[in-house]
UniProtKB/Swiss-Prot annotation:
It comes from Pseudechis australis. Residues 1-18 form the signal peptide. Expressed by the venom gland. Nerve growth factor is important for the development and maintenance of the sympathetic and sensory nervous systems. It stimulates division and differentiation of sympathetic and embryonic sensory neurons as well as basal forebrain cholinergic neurons in the brain. Its relevance in the snake venom is not clear. However, it has been shown to inhibit metalloproteinase-dependent proteolysis of platelet glycoprotein Ib alpha, suggesting a metalloproteinase inhibition to prevent metalloprotease autodigestion and/or protection against prey proteases. The keyword Transcription does not apply. The lineage of its organism: Eukaryota, Metazoa, Chordata, Craniata, Vertebrata. Belongs to the NGF-beta family. Homodimer; non-covalently linked. GO terms for molecular function: growth factor activity; lipid binding; metalloendopeptidase inhibitor activity; nerve growth factor receptor binding; toxin activity. This is Venom nerve growth factor 1. Gene3D superfamilies: Cystine-knot cytokines. PROSITE patterns: NGF_1 (PS00248), NGF_2 (PS50270).
Length: 242
């Protein structure tokens, strides 16, 4: 009987010692810890996924350099660059609006000295009243404002010309006033008014260099480029009259 009592007491003590421990004292690697780790990992993964989706919906803004390189036609220019400009030409201008068809209009705002250009053109027209005196040009020419994307510089290299320039949060276009021949032979014999019995003649467009805003590497810079500026008559003496 006493043996039975001892057996029951020992079984009771073993049961107490083997009772489940509290969650606060759960050893590392237990199922409860695994559940917490899995939950934390799931939350972290969900956070990364949400962050990735947010980045896709709202991509990071491009750097200024990336924006300038990606859009060469609308590069942001430091106003100090225009202070360093030298050898300004009346044939190069920057305008927020298309320039007038005739250069004596004053409805467009230019960065260059528009008034001086207009006065110069008007003075030339007053000093040379071609239509009133019946005078004629040796060659017929046409003049107009144009934009350029490429041109030949003073070294003979092909360079990129700026079309749109962002200056003080305003977009200006770079225009060039070009003059070229309308027809190489205004009359069947060549140039008008040339004695075809003694001379061979034809009209040709000549060029000159003007300072323009171009791209050099990743930066804007001033360079001399060729543009059409005049139409002249070229004559050669006929060999059969020598």
């Amino acid at each position: 009987m006493s043996m039975l009592c001892y057996t029951l007491i020992i079984a009771f003590l073993i049961g107490i010692w083997a009772a489940p421990q509290s969650e606060d004292n759960v050893p590392l690697g237990s199922p409860a810890t695994s559940d917490l780790s899995d939950t934390s990992c799931a939350q972290t993964h969900e956070g990364l996924k949400t962050s990735r989706n947010t980045d896709q919906r709202h991509p990071a803004p491009k750097k200024v350099d990336d924006q300038e390189l990606g859009s060469v036609a609308n590069i942001i220019v430091d106003p100090k660059l225009f202070q360093k400009r030298q050898f300004q030409s009346s044939r190069v201008l920057f305008s927020t609006q298309p320039p007038p068809l005739s250069r004596d209009e004053q409805s467009v705002e230019f960065l260059d000295n528009e008034d001086a250009l207009n006065r110069n053109i008007q003075a030339k027209r007053q000093n040379h009243p071609v239509h009133d005196l019946g005078e004629h040009s040796v060659c017929d020419s046409i003049s107009e404002w144009v934009t350029k994307t490429t041109a030949t510089d003073i070294k003979g290299n092909t360079v990129t010309v700026e079309v749109d320039v962002n200056l003080n949060n305003e977009v200006y276009k770079q225009y060039f006033f070009e003059t070229k021949c309308r027809n190489p032979n205004p009359v069947p014999s060549g140039c008008r008014g040339i004695d075809s019995r003694l001379w061979n003649s034809y009209c040709t467009t000549t060029q000159t260099f003007v300072k323009a805003l171009t791209m050099e590497g990743n930066q804007a810079s001033w360079r001399f480029i060729r543009i059409d500026t005049a139409c002249v008559c070229v004559i050669t003496k006929k060999t059969d009259n020598l």
